[in-house]
Amino acid sequence: MRNKGLSFYKKKKKISQELLREIFSWIFGIALSVFLAAVVVIFLGKSTRVVGMSMEPTLENGQQIFIDRFLYVLSSPKAGDVVAFLPNGNENSHYYVKRVVAGDKVRIADGTLYVNGQESKWVTERILDAGIAENEIILGNKEYFCIGDNPNNSEDSRSANIGPVEEGDMIGKAWFHLKSGTDGIGFIK
């Protein structure tokens, strides 16, 4: 008579060949996706941090952002784009992150930014220092006037040290930000 008590030996179930193939297929698919995402980010994108408070409230000091380096190969920056650039192409500088606001002519008068004679919708705060934009600036081909969303705490195209930004000095369009302080992750508007 057999004891029906504890049994420490159980028959092992064999894993079928089909199940193994399915598992490896999923693992390969996930690994390939991660690899392709890394290639896209490394070669077409860039990551950097915002330096300073010039883009508040849109972006905060130290906030991590992702830059699309490929977009401006196919098209040109548009008014409202948030871009990263090296001022005057200075490779030793940190990336400046500012908003493109201009068309052909830019001027700041009585604290208001005018683009082609019309009040700009991108800067609503009264600008205390017009800088070089006190006199009308006529932009050349592939030149852009870039300003911080917090213009009274921003070194931007109004500064003689920076001036209009040439398209060739732009790293790309900032398109996504990570969580910082009270701000969650999301697309840059």
What positions do the PLM features span?
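Beta-strand-rich cores of mature extracytoplasmic or soluble domains
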Residues: A133-K189
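Extracellular/periplasmic catalytic domains that process cell-envelope and extracellular macromolecules
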Residues: T58, S76, V106-R107, I137-G140
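Protein maturation boundaries and topogenic segments
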Residues: M1-S93, V165-K189
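Structural motif
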Residues: Q63, K78-V82, D104, E143, ...
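Mid-length scaffold segments of soluble, non-membrane domains
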Residues: S93-V115
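PP2C/PPM family metal-dependent serine/threonine protein phosphatase catalytic domain
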Residues: G111, V115-G131
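Short Gly/aromatic-enriched secondary-structure transition segments
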Residues: D81, L113, N161-G163
